């Protein structure tokens, strides 16, 4: 028995490795503070749970769901896009498809459009799935470095002409994981123009669309005139509604891109449990006040981490979005060396920036997914261990 050769090209999945290391230390009796994985610790809101309970009791939801999602779910997604972003004229029958979270839809989009020898343009640092899915599809990933001096936006002028001509997809993710960076509508306009020029499918991973603070409201790339000609956007309920375990989201945008994604999906999965789709519909109807109450929890945690690290000399500012704080390592350390130091001396688990790509070197990521008390304790442990930025 032998693995396929493609698996030899796949590095260990970052978060799985972090979890294994954490479990090994816990087995030894170490009190671990895990701020390494973006998995919200709060419960799913009560009205969503109630919608799920009612849907489970309805026997009509117990059979196979439509591959593309129920009509009711797709219409709710379209209505939410209109209400949230002002994106009008989306067709729920041809321009929306349900997904098992956004991760599977992202991966299956690579399978639908990338062939051997094709380039994918991916952010670096970035969600590891962009690179591994390129490998699974037989393509070649071209990294677009995200640098602090460019506000963690890719410099589109650095994409060589020969690469752009062979590129099938360009991936972006704003608000950004892991950097917490933001993108403007003006930047989206530049992306749309580039992708139109080279007939590249523009793919926007919008998993953190609602994870924003200080009054900021992240835009959709589909707000740009003409974007729907070349763009697909991926939405997930996982982070915004504390529903990571539910596995529900949708892809929306260009009808041809949705058709390709749907064709892969109909051959590899059987859709999302209809009761979960009912719960998702309730989630998209969540009152803005209630959603902001959820966000206020993460904003408080952000402030604890930022102020705590600032007190230890870190030159950082509070991010306006996502579940993460992107933090430079102290001078003289690599990201792996410093995160190992935090684990060994403080029992704190954080991922090294290099795990998100070569351009992530020099940083580590803090996830705002544990209680205020444990975040304060993490800062105290660092202080007690004499760990400072400089």
From Swiss-Prot:
Disulphide linkage map: none
Pfam family, one: Aminotran_1_2
Keywords recorded for this protein, A-Z: Aminotransferase, Pyridoxal phosphate, Transferase
Annotated function: Involved in the synthesis of meso-diaminopimelate (m-DAP or DL-DAP), required for both lysine and peptidoglycan biosynthesis. Catalyzes the direct conversion of tetrahydrodipicolinate to LL-diaminopimelate.
EC numbers: 2.6.1.83
Family note: Belongs to the class-I pyridoxal-phosphate-dependent aminotransferase family. LL-diaminopimelate aminotransferase subfamily.
GO molecular function: L,L-diaminopimelate aminotransferase activity; pyridoxal phosphate binding
Protein name in UniProt: LL-diaminopimelate aminotransferase 2
Binding positions for substrate per the UniProt entry: 13, 38, 103, 127, 177, 365
């Amino acid at each position: 028995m032998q693995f396929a050769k493609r698996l030899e090209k796949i590095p260990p999945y970052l978060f799985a490795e972090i979890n294994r290391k954490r479990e090994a230390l816990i087995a030894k009796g170490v009190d671990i503070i895990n701020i390494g994985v973006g998995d919200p610790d709060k419960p799913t809101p009560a009205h969503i749970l109630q919608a799920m309970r009612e849907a489970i009791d309805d026997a009509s939801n117990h059979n196979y769901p439509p591959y593309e999602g129920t009509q009711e779910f797709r219409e709710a997604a379209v209505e939410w896009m209109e209400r949230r972003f002002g994106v009008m004229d989306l067709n729920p029958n041809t321009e929306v498809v349900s997904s098992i979270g956004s991760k599977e839809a992202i991966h299956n989009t690579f399978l639908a459009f990338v062939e051997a020898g094709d380039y994918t343009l991916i952010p670096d640092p970035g969600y590891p799935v962009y690179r591994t899915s390129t490998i699974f599809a037989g393509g070649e990933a071209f990294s677009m470095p995200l640098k602090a001096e460019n506000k963690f936006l890719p410099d589109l002028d650095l994409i060589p002409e020969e690469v752009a001509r062979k590129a099938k997809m360009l991936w972006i993710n704003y608000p950004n994981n892991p950097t917490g960076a933001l993108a403007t509508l003006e930047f989206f306009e530049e992306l749309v123009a580039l992708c139109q020029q080279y007939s590249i499918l523009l793919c926007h991973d919008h998993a953190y669309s609602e994870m924003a603070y200080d009054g900021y409201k992240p835009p959709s790339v589909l707000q740009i005139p003409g974007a729907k000609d070349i763009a697909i956007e991926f939405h997930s309920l996982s982070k915004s509604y504390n529903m990571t375990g539910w596995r529900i989201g949708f892809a929306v945008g260009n009808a041809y891109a949705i058709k390709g994604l749907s064709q892969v999906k109909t051959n590899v999965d059987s859709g999302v449990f209809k009761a979960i789709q009912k719960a998702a519909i309730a989630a998209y109807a969540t009152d803005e006040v209630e959603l902001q109450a959820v966000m206020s929890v993460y904003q408080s945690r952000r402030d604890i981490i930022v102020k705590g690290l600032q007190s230890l000399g870190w030159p950082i500012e509070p991010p306006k979005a996502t579940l993460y704080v992107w933090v430079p390592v102290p001078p003289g350390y690599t990201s792996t060396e410093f995160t190992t130091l935090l684990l060994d001396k403080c029992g704190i688990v954080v991922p090294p920036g290099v795990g998100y790509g070569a351009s992530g070197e020099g940083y580590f990521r803090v996830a705002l997914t544990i209680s205020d008390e444990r975040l304060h304790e993490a800062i105290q442990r660092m202080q007690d261990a004499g760990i400072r930025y400089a």
